[in-house]
């Protein structure tokens, strides 16, 4: 039985890894072994940080809402509770956008929350 060498398959696999490693510094974009390690690590970082990004944005939105709420004499938690009591269903992303770009609209929402809390 003839010997089968996987030359084309190996070359294709290695070229694929080196293509993914394009732009890396030093030997990480030229040497297969080092490039493969870095591509695997990069994939792990990408996977982890796609989930981390969602947490980071939520933290940013809450920080912005809290800052704007405190200008209206409310804490973040009391503002959110007041909005829930008054039946205003607006998510944190939109509230943060209002707090940054349209402070008057945010102040109206904060007043509605205050009125509901003072009942």
Swiss-Prot record:
For biological process, the GO terms are: ribosomal large subunit assembly; translation
Matches recorded under PROSITE patterns: RIBOSOMAL_L20 (PS00937)
Entry-linked SUPFAM superfamilies: Ribosomal protein L20 (SSF74731)
Question: Keywords of this protein's UniProt record, alphabetized?
Answer: Ribonucleoprotein, Ribosomal protein, RNA-binding, rRNA-binding
**Keyword Ribonucleoprotein on this protein?**
yes
A Gene Ontology cellular-component term: ribosome
**Any GO molecular function:** rRNA binding
* Family annotation (InterPro entries): Ribosomal_bL20, RIBOSOMAL_L20_CS, Ribosomal_protein_bL20_C
Q: Which Pfam families match?
A: Ribosomal_L20 (PF00453)
Signal peptide extent: none
What is the documented function of this protein? Binds directly to 23S ribosomal RNA and is necessary for the in vitro assembly process of the 50S ribosomal subunit. It is not involved in the protein synthesizing functions of that subunit.
Write down the NCBIfam families for this protein, in alphabetical order: rplT_bact
**Family stated for the protein in its record:** Belongs to the bacterial ribosomal protein bL20 family.
Q: Specify the protein name.
A: Large ribosomal subunit protein bL20
């Amino acid at each position: 039985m003839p010997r089968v060498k996987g030359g084309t398959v190996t070359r294709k696999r290695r070229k694929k890894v080196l293509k993914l490693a394009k732009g890396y510094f030093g030997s990480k974009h030229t040497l297969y072994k080092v490039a493969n390690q870095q591509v695997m690590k990069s994939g792990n970082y990408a996977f982890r940080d796609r989930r981390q990004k969602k947490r980071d944005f939520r933290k940013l939105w809450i920080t912005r809402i809290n800052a704007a709420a405190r200008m209206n004499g409310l804490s973040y938690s009391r503002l959110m509770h007041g909005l829930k009591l008054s039946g205003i269903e607006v998510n944190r992303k939109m509230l943060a956008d209002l707090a940054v770009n349209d402070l008057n609209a945010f102040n109206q929402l904060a007043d509605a929350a205050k009125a509901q809390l003072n009942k």
